[in-house]
């Protein structure tokens, strides 16, 4: 599959000079993961920060894309609420799910929280043809809402 990868940080916001379209291996679902074909991906400030390498540096090489939507094409064995064919959008806060903040429903306060496509290392972001996330980090979108919306 194709992915937009960078191995260096942009100088003077020259993002074109660092981005390269490459072939990479398709993800395989872990028990709690969903795999989806990316239909739309947005550019937000986390992606810009990642490509700049500041204020926080992402691990390199890197695939950004903190916001993506698409169609589910595979699921892990433990996935319960998402099925192949569902239309989903990413929810990029990856948290531990076991600390007090997480169990109280405040995942945004998790001290181990990471942002998908920004600081999750091998859990690449959505600037690729096929992406993966834990089931808890996707939300179904209704048929009357486009992927771009």
Set out the residue ranges of the language-model regions:
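Iron-sulfur (Fe-S) cluster-binding segments and ferredoxin-like electron-carrier domains
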Residues: 103-121
């Amino acid at each position: 599959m194709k992915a937009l990868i960078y191995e260096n940080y942009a100088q003077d916001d020259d993002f074109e000079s660092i981005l390269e379209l490459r072939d990479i291996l398709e993800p395989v679902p872990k028990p709690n993961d969903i795999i989806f074909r990316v239909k739309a991906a947005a550019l937000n400030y986390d992606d810009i920060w990642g490509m700049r390498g500041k204020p926080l540096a992402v691990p390199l090489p890197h695939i950004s894309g903190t916001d993506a939507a698409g169609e589910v094409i595979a699921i892990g064995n433990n996935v319960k609420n998402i099925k192949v064919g569902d239309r989903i959008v990413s929810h990029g806060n990856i948290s531990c799910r076991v600390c007090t903040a997480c169990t109280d429903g405040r995942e945004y306060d998790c001290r181990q929280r990471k942002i998908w496509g920004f600081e999750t290392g091998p859990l690449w972001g959505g600037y690729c043809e096929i992406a993966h996330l834990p089931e808890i980090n996707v939300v179904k979108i209704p048929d009357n809402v486009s992927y771009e919306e």
